[in-house]
Each structure stands twice: as structure tokens, then as C-alpha cells.
Amino acid sequence: MNFKYIVAVSFLIASAYARSEENDEQSLSQRDVLEEESLREIRGIGTKIIGGLKTAVKGALKELASTYVNGKRTAEDHEVMKRLEAVMRDLDSLDYPEEASERETRGFNQEEIANLFTKKEKRILGPVLGLVGSALGGLIKKIG
């Protein structure tokens, strides 16, 4: 009788352990899915922000170009225009971030991919905002 009791208790413990392992695996896969969805949302928001900035920079660049067509540019103005053109090329390369990130991030895990994406955004957005601010400031000074 004791042997049957020991076998029954062992079987119950083993089945409970198997169920808990199965539940752990399911919760991990659900967590992975949620993390992936949140990364997609973050990328979507970043893409929208970059798209808006790109449109604003293109508008500012066109305005600056039309301003400088009829007038002479100083060396400083020429340098600002060169920087804006370089920024525009960088922004154009961000139109297809999935392809670029696929090439750059083969073999990385999701967290490293998210870190690379935010580093790239910071690297591009910092100079863009500075250049747009200085260009618009110069334009406002000349108009006003």
C-alpha cells in the first residue's frame, strides 16, 4: 500500500511539474509576442516622426534654395546648404528602414535591434534639428 501511495504522489508531482513547465513556455512565448509588437509600435512611431521631420526639412530646404537663388550666398550659407543636403540624403535612406536594419543587424536579438534603431534616430535627429533651427533662424532674420 505504501508503494502505491508513493507512486501516485510521484505521478501527481510529475504531472503538476509538467503543467507548470508548459505554462511557463506559453507565458514566455506570449511575452515575446508582446515585446515584438511593442517594438513594431515604437518603430512605427519613429518612422512617422522621421517622415514629418523629413517633410519639414524638405520644405525648409526648398524655401532656403528659393531665397538663395536670387541672392549671393556667403561661405557660411553654402556650408549650411551642404549640411542640409547631406541630412536629406540620410533621411532618404531611412525610407526603407526594414531593409537597412536587416542588413545591419543579422544575428542580433530584438533588444539589440531596438537599441540600434534608437541610436540611429538620435544620430540623425540631433543634427537635423540643429540645422533646421539654424537655417530657419537665419531665414527669419533675413526676412524680418
UniProtKB/Swiss-Prot annotation:
<dbReference type="GO" id="GO:0050832">
    <property type="term" value="P:defense response to fungus"/>
</dbReference>
<keyword id="KW-0929">Antimicrobial</keyword>
<comment type="similarity">
    <text>Belongs to the bombinin family.</text>
</comment>
<comment type="function">
    <text>Maximin-H11 shows antimicrobial activity against bacteria and against the fungus C.albicans. Shows strong hemolytic activity.</text>
</comment>
<keyword id="KW-0204">Cytolysis</keyword>
<dbReference type="GO" id="GO:0005576">
    <property type="term" value="C:extracellular region"/>
</dbReference>
<keyword id="KW-0044">Antibiotic</keyword>
<keyword id="KW-0964">Secreted</keyword>
<dbReference type="InterPro" id="IPR007962">
    <property type="entry name" value="Bombinin"/>
</dbReference>
<dbReference type="GO" id="GO:0042742">
    <property type="term" value="P:defense response to bacterium"/>
</dbReference>
<feature type="modified residue" description="Asparagine amide">
    <location>
        <position position="70"/>
    </location>
</feature>
<dbReference type="GO" id="GO:0031640">
    <property type="term" value="P:killing of cells of another organism"/>
</dbReference>
<keyword id="KW-0732">Signal</keyword>
<comment type="function">
    <text>Maximin-11 shows antimicrobial activity against bacteria and against the fungus C.albicans. It has little hemolytic activity.</text>
</comment>
<dbReference type="Pfam" id="PF05298">
    <property type="entry name" value="Bombinin"/>
</dbReference>
<keyword id="KW-0295">Fungicide</keyword>
<keyword id="KW-0027">Amidation</keyword>
<feature type="propeptide">
    <location>
        <begin position="74"/>
        <end position="123"/>
    </location>
</feature>
<keyword id="KW-0354">Hemolysis</keyword>
<feature type="modified residue" description="Isoleucine amide">
    <location>
        <position position="143"/>
    </location>
</feature>
<feature type="signal peptide">
    <location>
        <begin position="1"/>
        <end position="18"/>
    </location>
</feature>
<keyword id="KW-0165">Cleavage on pair of basic residues</keyword>
<feature type="propeptide">
    <location>
        <begin position="19"/>
        <end position="43"/>
    </location>
</feature>
<keyword id="KW-0878">Amphibian defense peptide</keyword>
<protein>
    <recommendedName>
        <fullName>Maximins 11/H11</fullName>
    </recommendedName>
</protein>
